[in-house]
Swiss-Prot record:
One of its GO terms (cellular component) is cytosol. One of its GO terms (biological process) is dTMP biosynthetic process. Its EC number is 2.1.1.45. This is Thymidylate synthase. Keywords: Cytoplasm, Methyltransferase, Nucleotide biosynthesis, Transferase. PROSITE patterns: THYMIDYLATE_SYNTHASE. Belongs to the thymidylate synthase family. Bacterial-type ThyA subfamily. The keyword Methyltransferase applies. It is found in: Cytoplasm. Its main location: cytoplasm. The gene is thyA.
Length: 283
């Protein structure tokens, strides 16, 4: 929690104003932030200075794992995070590749689970990673990536957190996640949960011990219409104790995640928090 608040304060104190063409808004911006989560010790990085909806963040990551490309599918598993980008982004509404209401196009897991090969066909990056890790293999390239510049024009949004690199030392699994851009007031509390969850669940289904997760953000920013709430409300609140994430131990395979897992398979203990803050969302 401290590292999150330190980053927020750093942006407020040291950030530079940058005009964002996509949203038409100014962003207070810093370059490079590194956060670390001790997954092995169960230190769940859920924001306490406002109410955070961790199940929506986990649902979104499970949607990526399943390769979803439709906002309706994300809604069915418990998150509405793709509604606006699918249906209110004018550039996407005008895009000939859009297939209709709720279509997101080639986003995140749709790319990562079907990464195109230059000679035809595709690679299921995640299935390869899970197979290797279960068999004690780390080829120093166990990377689940969503980043394909050749497909950007075929999706409603380029991936923000675009790469998840797993590493195995002895029987302990580590994760390095890289994020090109981060809306810190709205997105980071989700992204922290997702990095933690991804390492925790992959360690569980591969039979490994979870170690540390390392989260690199390149462009960290606060939008101009979020600044007052962050500076004058959230940063004035005292952080509370760290909760614990409980994952159903019956989840034992990638197939389980793809088929029967629901948000009922996840819960938290000891989550005390301040009231919610409704930050503006920029499409």
């Amino acid at each position: 929690m401290k590292q999150y608040l330190d980053l927020c304060q750093r942006i407020v104190d040291d950030g530079k104003w940058v005009n964002n063409e996509r949203t038409g808004k100014k962003c207070l911006t810093v370059i490079n932030a590194d956060l670390t989560y001790n997954v092995g010790n169960g230190e769940f990085p859920l924001v306490t200075t406002r109410k955070s909806f961790y199940k929506s963040a986990i649902a979104e990551m499970i949607g990526y794992i399943r390769g979803y490309d439709n906002a309706a599918d994300f809604r069915k598993i418990g998150t509405s995070t793709w509604d606006a980008n699918a249906n209110q982004n004018q550039a996407w509404l005008d895009n000939p590749h859009r297939k209709g209401e709720d279509d997101c196009g080639l986003i995140y897991g749709k790319i990562g689970r079907n990464f195109p090969k230059p000679d035809g066909g595709s690679i299921d990056l995640l299935a390869k990673i899970i197979y290797d890790l279960k068999n004690g293999i780390d080829d120093r390239g166990e990377i689940f990536t969503f980043y394909h510049p050749g497909a950007f024009h075929m999706g409603c949004l380029r991936p923000c957190m675009y790469s998840h690199h797993f590493s195995l030392l002895d029987d302990t699994l580590y994760l390095n996640s890289t994020q090109r851009s981060c809306d810190v007031p709205l997105g980071l509390n989700f992204n922290m949960v997702q990095v933690y969850f991804l390492l925790a669940i992959v360690a569980q289904i591969t039979g490994k011990k979870a170690g540390m997760a390392y989260h690199k953000i390149v462009n960290a920013h606060i939008y101009e219409d979020q600044l007052e709430l962050m500076r004058d409300v959230q940063l004035k609140r005292e952080p509370l104790g760290m909760p614990k994430l409980i994952i159903n131990p019956d989840i034992k395979s990638l197939e389980d995640l793809e088929t029967w897992v629901t948000m009922d398979d996840f819960s938290i203990e000891g989550y005390a928090h301040h009231p919610a803050i409704k930050y503006p969302f920029s499409v």
